[in-house]
Amino acid sequence: MTERFQQKNISVPDGIWIMRQTWNDVLFAHWPVDVSILRALVPSVLELDTYNGQAWISMLPFMLTNLRARYLPVIPGARAFPELNLRTYVTYKGKPGIYFFSLDADHRLAVLGARTFFHLPYFYADMKSEKNGDAIDYVSKRKNDKEAAFHAAYRPISAPFTAEKDSLDYWLTERYRLYTTYRNKLYYEDIHHHPWLLQNAEAEISVNTVTDAHGITLPESDPLLHYAKKQDVLFWPLRKWS
């Protein structure tokens, strides 16, 4: 176990990981949202997690690479494709995690597999991520849903840092479990990675109707922004909560 893991006391989930992938040029765009708005959109079995009483949502555009199952090579055609996640923060029986409203990806097989085997709300979208120096131009338009579109230009503007435990930065980024529901049953999946090496970021989000498509109205204030250059992630099997 590496020094960075030891310093942050991040434990490895039980069992054997089944999938790995790499996230590149990740933008975290965070907005405070009224608890009452999110409560109506999140399954009642989950408790909304708040930081000093405030609920948050986050959008994460990034480029996904090296998607593969354990012991197998990279999935054909999945060497690199964009993904865009919309999420909020929840707990279940004291265990913090995230809940996804949507995950857009520009890879039909990945979308089908995630919907079928992980019961996650993936959508197929036309997407493009272009990098020029340290600046990224990112465009997404969901297929068959013209209202779910996103366009942002972003770049890092600080030296890398790891978030201090108990800080808002840490609370928003260091999450190692996702929750989802299927046929009125609660499921969870654990992930594992190094602590995020973050940078402050600037972004111009010129189009964002993804939140509108899910009934979430964003505040007029600017989002809190972070950037991460790269993160290797391991995934454990989806489990039903007994």
Swiss-Prot record:
Gene3D superfamilies: Acetoacetate decarboxylase-like. Pfam families: DUF2071 (PF09844). PANTHER family: DUF2071 DOMAIN-CONTAINING PROTEIN, DUF2071 FAMILY PROTEIN. This is Uncharacterized protein YqjF. It comes from Bacillus subtilis (strain 168).
